């Protein structure tokens, strides 16, 4: 049996071997060097893809050297792969011998490629980048368009001066006229065409934004809009406003018209006689007697006080019964000073009380607030005026809502943090009171549908009303705050519902 196998091997011997399962880690040259090390005279390595991948044909000088190489290479492990080596069939050996070795073919291909490159003329490549000499090698944006003004006599005169001073520009203009099939300028002067006169006005409007604003809904739909879904509309409004500011032409500042409102005369202007102006025109001087009616001399009037029995029972003596109501009457009118002698003779004269200036009140109020919070001046300086608030669509259909001790703030900028809101709304609590510090809280939404909104909890409705009045419209990080009272579900009074069986005691 072994003799028959050896006989078959002897009959199938050839000079070419087929080597399968070559390691993929080896390159083409390394595979050729490996097989030539075992005595191969020429090697053809097949491609690394397809059904014949990781295979090679090796041709030897004789069948004896091929059989020796087969015995040494068959079942040899290289880089974790076991080689399978066989004698090639006559058809395979004929095709292999017909084709040149791989190394020879690659050299011939390289030589042929170089020959073709030499035959082709070197055409200079046009560099269409912006400024290659300055390092700007990227291409220009094809969507950009120039916005030239319409022709005028001044512009055409300047172009004529440039044509006279730059000969190359003159030649290029002639080339362009020839390319556009325009009439030749080398002839008598033609009649001037009518000039296109553009009315002086602002520049054309800018291109429409990428995200145009959506059409407005009906009033019924706008009333049902949730207060948490206002971020997209506000962002679009902000982008449109910024685009308008960028593309808006420069304008002269309008002169503010002085309002011709008639000043109403005040009581103090009528009481005190103004000093006569030496430079002004002399006129009749009015006396108080000419303006006010003179009090008539009447008899002494009696003042009666009607006191209830409950009040008289509380008072200790009869002397106090007469003094106490008079004191109450004077306390009810702290802004007036009435003398006892004048009350006996008519109503007397009324003088305005000395009012503390507003600046002093603001200074006293700011002194009570710690320096770590915003001052009243900074609030007024950063708050929008009423006219500016009416122009913004963020405040369209704005309503403060029912007063509660919790504020709802929207249109908050992305870069605003809780410490910024604490810096503003911390002035409306008493830092020394632990109870108010615990009741003061800030919830700022930075993600989801409620992004750009915040809730401020204050100790009382009074402080919340004051905070809403002073902070609504305050510009924080380039966006005005829209402050409202937060919606709260108030419990219904049980006495108002007749189905629940009346009031509980």
From Swiss-Prot:
One of its GO terms (molecular function) is U12 snRNA binding. InterPro entries: Nucleotide-bd_a/b_plait_sf, RBD_domain_sf, RBM40_RRM1, RBM41/RNPC3, RRM_dom. Residues 221-235, 361-370 have a biased composition (Acidic residues). Residues 193-214 have a biased composition (Pro residues). Disruption phenotype: Larval lethal with complete lethality by 10 days post-fertilization. Development of multiple organs is affected. Head, eye, lens, pancreas and liver are smaller than normal, and the swim bladder fails to inflate. The intestinal epithelium also remains thin and unfolded. U12-type introns are retained in mRNAs, whereas excision of U2-type introns is not affected. Assembly of both U12- and U11-containing snRNP complexes may be abnormal. Gene expression levels are broadly impacted; effects are not limited to U12-type intron-containing genes. It is found in: Nucleus. Residues 491-505 have a biased composition (Basic and acidic residues). Keywords: mRNA processing, mRNA splicing, Nucleus, Repeat, RNA-binding, Spliceosome. The keyword Nucleus applies. SMART domains: RRM. One of its GO terms (biological process) is liver development. It comes from the Eukaryota. GO terms for cellular component: U12-type spliceosomal complex. Residues 15-90, 405-488 form the RRM domain. Residues 96-123, 193-236, 354-374, 486-505 are annotated as: Disordered. Component of the U11/U12 snRNPs that are part of the U12-type spliceosome. Participates in pre-mRNA U12-dependent splicing, performed by the minor spliceosome which removes U12-type introns. U12-type introns comprise less than 1% of all non-coding sequences. This is RNA-binding region-containing protein 3. It comes from Danio rerio (Zebrafish). The gene is rnpc3.
